[in-house]
Curated annotation (Swiss-Prot):
Family (UniProt): Belongs to the CoaE family.
Principal place of residence: cytoplasm
Binding-site residues for ATP, renumbered to this chain: G16, S17, G18, K19, S20, M21
Protein name (database record): Dephospho-CoA kinase
Primary role: Catalyzes the phosphorylation of the 3'-hydroxyl group of dephosphocoenzyme A to form coenzyme A.
């Protein structure tokens, strides 16, 4: 019997929007989850070509070894460079995103063989990197700027000023919303977000079942 691809769903949103929480909820409801940003971070310390490329871009001092002897990357230093240097940001993305795309294709193949109904792809820069191509549904999670800053600071992602600088170089919420199939407002409680995600899951499951 021929394996059928699952419904491919992209979830994105700016820093502090709550996209990761939506993805965790979807995973708890039975969706398979591909975390593009996690895969990208793994490539940065495991893929020899990526390591060579990052070293060429930012210098060998961005890498070090932890007490366990494992290679680690100083992402904070890199973030400070790329958020003020679009050329290096573009070079970094061109280095990593094609390899993430290969990993996602492998995840799609595995999901099809396992008869998975819905595969969710979480990515911070889904549209910006072109990673939305081929997806069936794209969900954008949004929240008020002040709330996003507060969440990011609470997570220890930087000071208020650092977070605001990062938000300033991300795509505007209006631009993301215009490209989305579904927009989820996350200005409320985690419980409210769960209910919205549950409704989304039920809609996605209906779409997935129609394909099988």
């Amino acid at each position: 019997m021929e394996s059928k691809l699952p419904l491919l769903v992209g979830v994105t949103g700016g820093l502090g929007s709550g996209k990761s929480m939506v993805c965790r909820y979807l995973a708890s409801m039975g969706c398979a989850l591909f975390e593009a940003d996690v895969v990208a971070k793994e490539l940065q310390v495991r893929d020899s070509k990526v390591i060579e490329g990052i070293t060429a871009l930012f210098g060998k001092e961005v890498y070090s070894y932890n007490p366990k002897g494992e290679l680690q990357l100083n992402r904070k230093d890199i973030a400070q460079v790329v958020f003020s240097n679009q050329e290096k940001l573009g070079a970094l993305n061109r280095l990593i995103h094609p390899r993430v795309a290969v990993a996602f294709q492998q995840a799609c193949d595995n999901a099809a063989r396992s008869n998975v109904a819905i595969l969710v792809k979480e990515a911070a820069i889904l549209f910006e990197s072109g990673a939305h191509a081929g997806l069936d549904v794209v969900v954008v999670v949004q929240a008020a700027t002040e709330l996003r800053v507060e969440r990011a600071v609470q997570k220890g992602l930087g000071t208020r000023e650092e977070i605001l600088r990062r938000l300033a170089v991300q795509w505007a919420p209006e631009k993301l919303a215009a490209l989305a199939d579904v927009v989820i407002d996350n200005n409320g409680t985690p419980e409210a977000l769960y209910e919205k995600t549950k409704q989304l899951y039920e809609q996605l499951l209906q779409q997935a079942m129609l394909r099988r």
